[in-house]
A protein has these predicted regions:
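Inter-motif core of Ras-like GTPase G domains
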Residues: 2, 10-34
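Well-ordered beta-strand positions
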Residues: 3, 25, 81-85
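Short glycine-/polar-rich loops that comprise or flank the Walker A/P-loop
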Residues: 23-25, 53-57
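G-domain G4 guanine-recognition motif of GTPases
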Residues: 31-32, 57-69, 86-93
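Conserved C-terminal guanine-recognition region of P-loop GTPase G domains, centered on the G4
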Residues: 40-54
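Beta-strand-loop-alpha "switch" segments that mediate conformational coupling across diverse proteins
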Residues: 63, 75-104, 117
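NTP-binding/hydrolysis catalytic cores, primarily Walker-type P-loop NTPases
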Residues: 99-129
Length: 129
């Protein structure tokens, strides 16, 4: 396979750590609440102690609840890392597409979120070349 995507959820375990260590790119999706950003900082510091090059991280700030919460700039300052992309709040479009078992990029192709997801896919491919 050219690409293998594994969703490791929220845990670091004896099973997930070797996968993380062998990965070419690690995508971390974080929310806009202070607690999530703080935990992400702890995780990135831990990954660094394992010898993982933090340049392999591709951070995405997910605005799942609108404009509330921490800004991209503030999150980058806390993390001392660049956030590569911010996913916009998609309102009810995401839920509608999900409930109808349709990709958001097909159900709402002109939605800003759909555009960002297509851009994300392109950027990830470029990052791994």
């Amino acid at each position: 396979f050219d690409y293998i995507i594994i969703d490791l959820g929220r845990s670091l375990s004896r099973i997930s750590l070797p996968i993380i260590q062998k990965s070419d790119l690690l995508i971390l999706i974080l929310g806009t609440d202070q607690g999530t950003v703080t935990i992400t900082k702890s995780v990135t510091e831990y990954l660094k102690t394992l010898g993982i090059d933090l340049k392999k991280l591709y951070l995405i700030l997910n605005r799942a609840i609108g404009l509330e919460g921490i800004t991209k700039t503030d999150a980058e300052k806390i993390l001392d890392l660049d956030i590569k992309m911010t996913m916009p709040y998609m309102g009810g479009n995401f839920t509608t597409a999900n409930n109808q078992s349709q990709p958001i990029t097909h159900k709402f192709p002109n939605d800003t979120g759909a555009f960002m997801l297509r851009s994300l896919a392109k950027n990830i491919i470029e990052e791994t070349r």
